[in-house]
């Protein structure tokens, strides 16, 4: 199947909306004012095999973030049109007890993988990769801790505990919490090596995921490769393998637009299940079987 897509979007800044620590002891009036960011992404797709086409508002995201104290930040984000559905995405408070250390509680994206952690305004392609869309795409409610080391050998370490019941079943009680750990190693300003692992238990089957990714970036090029391995407890489903690799070259423009990008990608995924069970057969359901 060949899918052609064009996309137009209005976007926020690269680091837009995340809760940040203020480098001051006392807040002024302007420091209490919230930041408002948004991403509106519309696209047109044409499917050559069936000669069918469609227009779609893929995202209409808006976020509000700010500080109530130099070391206490907040963020709330909603998508008014995620393929036609309204979804509450982020709703959290973040505390910075000391410099470079933070704790976050609330609803957020789980720290896992490279591509699944990108917001729509950071995506390189009109359609997300299989890792970002299916295999590694998790938002949940929980508590995370993050530490950034800027000296010596720089790195960012994140980890957290989560309900595991998604965004809509927050009142459920759990005997086992999900966890996720992510480490970013930054040998220099151009390289990023990311290693992460996650355990989830959506119903009765424990699922473990392991991800490794690396990218190189300079003023013109972004080259990235990522591999995700997913295994199911008691061999309830075949192990899943997913790969996302791409290259992006930016050509600067002087008028109207800032740049034009040339991209190529290899994206694959074996049969995948999110852990939901068929009520009749009691077997795990294959997601997006007709992909």
Task: Describe these PLM feature segments.
Residues 1-20:
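Cleavable N-terminal export/targeting peptides
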Residues 13-14, 46-51, 69, 92-96, ...:
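Outer-membrane beta-barrel pore domains
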Residues 15-22, 102, 208:
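An N-terminal domain-start capping segment
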Residues 21-24, 255-257:
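Intrinsically disordered, low-complexity Ser/Thr- and acidic-rich flexible linkers and loops
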Residues 24-164, 175, 183-192, 246, ...:
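Outer membrane beta-barrel
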Residues 169-173:
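Active-site cleft segment of glycoside hydrolase catalytic domains centered on the general acid/base Glu
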Residues 178:
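Conserved adenosyl
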């Amino acid at each position: 199947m060949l899918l052609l897509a064009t996309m137009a979007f209005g976007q926020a800044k690269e680091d837009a909306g995340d809760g940040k620590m203020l480098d001051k002891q006392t807040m002024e009036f302007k420091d209490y004012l919230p930041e408002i960011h948004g991403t509106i992404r519309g696209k047109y797709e044409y499917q050559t095999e069936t000669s069918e086409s469609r227009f779609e508002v893929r995202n209409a995201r808006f976020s509000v973030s700010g500080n109530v104290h130099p070391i206490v930040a907040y963020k709330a984000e909603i998508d008014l049109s995620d393929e036609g559905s309204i979804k509450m995405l982020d709703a959290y408070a973040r505390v910075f007890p000391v410099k470079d250390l933070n704790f976050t509680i609330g609803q957020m994206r789980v720290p896992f993988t490279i591509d699944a952690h990108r917001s729509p305004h950071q995506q390189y392609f009109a359609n997300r990769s299989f890792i970002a869309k299916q295999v590694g795409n998790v938002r949940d409610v929980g508590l995370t801790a993050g530490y950034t080391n800027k000296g010596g050998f720089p790195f960012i370490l994140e980890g957290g505990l989560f309900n595991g019941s998604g965004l809509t079943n927050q009142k459920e009680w759990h005997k086992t919490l999900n966890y996720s750990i992510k480490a970013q190693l930054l040998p220099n300003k151009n390289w990023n090596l990311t290693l992460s692992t996650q355990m989830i238990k959506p119903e009765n089957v424990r699922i473990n995921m392991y991800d490794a990714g690396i990218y190189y970036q300079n003023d013109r090029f972004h080259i990235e490769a990522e591999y995700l391995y997913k295994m199911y407890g008691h061999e309830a489903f075949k192990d899943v393998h997913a790969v996302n690799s791409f290259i992006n070259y930016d050509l600067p423009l002087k008028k109207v637009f800032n740049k034009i990008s040339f991209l190529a990608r290899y994206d694959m995924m074996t049969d995948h299940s999110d852990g939901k069970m068929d009520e009749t057969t009691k077997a795990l359901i294959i997601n997006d079987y007709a992909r």
